[in-house]
Amino acid sequence: MSRVFKKTCSNGKLSIYLGKRDFVDHVDMVEPIDGVVLVDPEYLKGRKMFVMLTCAFRYGHDDLDVIGLTFRKDLYVQVQQVVPAESSSPRGSLTVLQERLLHKLGDNAYPFTLQMVVNLPCSVTLQPGPDDTGKACGVDFEVKSFCAENLEEKVSKRDSVRLVIRKIQFAPLEPGPGPWARLCRRFLLSAQPLLLQAWMDKEVNYHGQPISVNVSINNSTNKVIKKIKISVDQITDVVLYSLDKYTKTVFVQEFTETIAANSTFSKSFAVTPLLADNCHKQGLALDGKLKQGDTNLASSTILRPGVDKELLGILVSYKVRVNLMVSCEGILGDLTASEVGVELPLILMHPKPSNEAASSEDIVIEEFAQQEPSGESQEALAAEGNEGS
């Protein structure tokens, strides 16, 4: 059974069909966007029909536009003329889903295929505050279709149909070794140093799964370690127009472990940063949203050699911090306590899902609410039910 996403413009004359809304970046290529557009022939009336792919960086909200504060930059725009098809446009073979849709929808349906370039960012959304309205800040992708005499003609929202998609990356199948860090710290009146080592078993960790952080301590000093604090920070770099950097702690936990002077310690700790524990932190980077509640903490940005960082708009990275609370022995020891620690880079991503091809010729269409002329409506999915091919 094949799942198809459908959206119709508010005048009901133009509909767009896509087989999926998540398109995978495989580093050397990105999955093509193949779909079908259905148009009322009376509405077309000899005009041209276009399909447009836009990757945009938004830093600001629609309601600020009246005072000129909204910041939006189109990072990439690709336009394909679908009707009449241009002879210069590459014409590849139709996908199985396109063939089924064309057979089902009839002569007024037209296929299209868009191919992203490889140096575009993945979809990222900055978590809005409780009073924020309009589109969230971040990087988003949109497929739009409209009819016009030419590309210079101004087309109203009522006469166009737009569907948000996502560009995503999955973790590499063969990740490298886990990160490792070491700290040697000497203290006054202690002949020997404190040695702290921390490492992770894997280079890449998955969203929602515990991260194993291994800690080894050789305390050859006269100090006492009262507790171990492990935290995970998300670092978001807005690189398109400025050097803004935001650091948000997405996990922190203190472990009461007493490590006496002239002793050793070794233990593995499990930490799990989750969006559910950070849902009220404004400015937190999330994987791009398609509908309410369908996302998670943003995946780490994987940079390709030679890519212009400004084209990526927003860069996301993570680090794990392991801190020791070190104090002197005795009642007044806590008054002179100090922290020492190390940092580990963390790559947080989704595992690559198994490819399960649809074997049935049935099509299930999930239709979105028609978009309102005044702007984007809430994209609530309503299953249209099982549609035969």
Swiss-Prot record:
Expressed in cone photoreceptors in the retina (at protein level). Transmembrane segments: none annotated. GO terms for cellular component: photoreceptor inner segment; photoreceptor outer segment. Keywords: Cell projection, Disulfide bond, Sensory transduction, Vision. Disulfide bonds: none annotated. Its main location: other. Residues 369-389 are annotated as: Disordered. This is Arrestin-C. It comes from Bos taurus (Bovine). The lineage of its organism: Eukaryota, Metazoa, Chordata, Craniata, Vertebrata. The gene is ARR3.
